[in-house]
């Protein structure tokens, strides 16, 4: 695909992702939304399924010749690998969505020959979108420099903490180390 086509696609996906935010947040803010579980035990919500439906409707309308692999409908049975496909996760971080931590995203990517070509990640809870095209130089953003605190910063999933993770945190605590967990 040519660069101008990719820029048009990324713009369309950004608009689509932004249009999903109010729908997803309406469910997120509902105190009584239901959660069910897939065969693998992972949770799925009405927001997952609504996002899935709206994203697939858009992609099938505008890009009908490109197959779609979505977390909410993918099964390996009968799957034929494609050189080009959409990779979709309507709510990445469903456990965080259910726990109302705000740490969940909507992800849409175009994959060609096993490599990501472009992608959009939207964070409805903070009203932000990140996007990129792999053939272009990434946009740079100046980072704010801060004085480091005395706390160790540890990147660890809040939803998937293991016994080993807990033992490690206990070890640090017993040895007087301050810890800040970043999820």
Regions found by a protein language model. Name each.
Residues 77-78, 95-98, 129:
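Conserved protein kinase catalytic core
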Residues 31-33, 42, 95-96, 102, ...:
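Flexible, active-site-adjacent loop/turn segments at secondary-structure boundaries
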Residues 1-91, 162-178:
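N-terminal subdomain of lithium-sensitive/metallo-dependent phosphomonoesterases centered on the IMPase/IPPase/PAP
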Residues 68, 86, 106, 154-155:
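Well-ordered beta-strand positions enriched in small/hydrophobic/aromatic, beta-favoring residues
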Residues 82-124:
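Glycine-rich active-site/cofactor-binding loop and its immediate structural neighborhood
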Residues 108-183:
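Acidic beta-strand-loop-alpha-helix segment within the catalytic core
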């Amino acid at each position: 695909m040519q660069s101008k086509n990719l820029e048009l696609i990324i713009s369309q996906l950004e608009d689509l992702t932004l249009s999903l935010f109010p729908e997803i947040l309406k469910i997120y803010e509902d105190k009584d939304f239901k959660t069910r579980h897939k065969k693998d035990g992972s949770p799925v919500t009405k927001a997952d399924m609504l996002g899935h439906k709206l994203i697939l409707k858009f992609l099938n309308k505008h890009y009908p010749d490109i197959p779609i692999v979505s977390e909410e409908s993918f099964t390996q049975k009968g799957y034929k690998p494609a050189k080009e496909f959409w990779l979709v996760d309507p709510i990445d971080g469903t456990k965080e969505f259910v726990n109302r931590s705000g740490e969940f995203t909507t992800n849409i990517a175009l994959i060609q020959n096993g490599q990501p070509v472009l992608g959009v990640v939207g964070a409805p809870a903070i009203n932000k979108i990140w996007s990129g095209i792999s053939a272009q130089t990434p946009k740079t953003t100046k980072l704010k420099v801060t004085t480091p605190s005395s706390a160790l910063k540890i990147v660890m999933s809040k939803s998937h903490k293991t016994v080993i993770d807990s033992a490690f945190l206990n070890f640090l605590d017993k040895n007087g180390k301050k810890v800040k967990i970043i999820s």
